[in-house]
Amino acid sequence: MTPALVAALPAFALYTFIQAITPGPANLCSLATTMRIGVRPALRQWVGLTIGFFVVMAVAMAALLGATSLIEGALPALTVAGAAYVLWLAWSMVRPGEGQGFNGVQPTIGAGVVLQVTNVKLLVMSSTALVAYVIPYTSDLAVLAAIGFAVPIVGSACNLAWIYGGVHLQAFYERHRRPVDAIMAAALALCAVGMLAALV
């Protein structure tokens, strides 16, 4: 590692942490899943979120190393698909019915993977971290991969904070189920709107 890269790592770490800890589709879904049905189903979904995060990071690194035109061509479709999925999750939270999860949406490993790979914010965040803080200072693929895969590790750890935060909010949720569902659904809908706004 070059001295310039070492000097850039604290800013990279701060950027990654801030992006990972703030509300987004994965963090909001994890919080809502924990509040609604408990930590065990949320942890099952978290495994999928983590797998999806690593997949997205691998795609970001591949795009930055040469497949950029392929990724750029797929971004609009991925954005629309991701926004549609997040809107569907929001609707699932507030529609009538008492299903498990989000009224029938099961918090599975597969659901976690789908949420992450359609989360274009995640692809943009991952790419930005590499472009701003790593690629200007090294062309070593091993260093790029090592630092790049730190992003999903930090992101997954931050997602766990949202899951365990939900544990402490379960009693509150049980007393205020409808308003909390409405607020969480609105937050997810805002995430979807933000995703679509990036297309304009």
Regions found by a protein language model. Give the residues of each.
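Alpha-helical multi-pass membrane helix bundles of inner-membrane/thylakoid proteins
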Residues: 2-5, 76-77, 88-127, 168-186, ...
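Juxtamembrane boundary at the C-terminal end of a transmembrane helix
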Residues: 8, 193-200
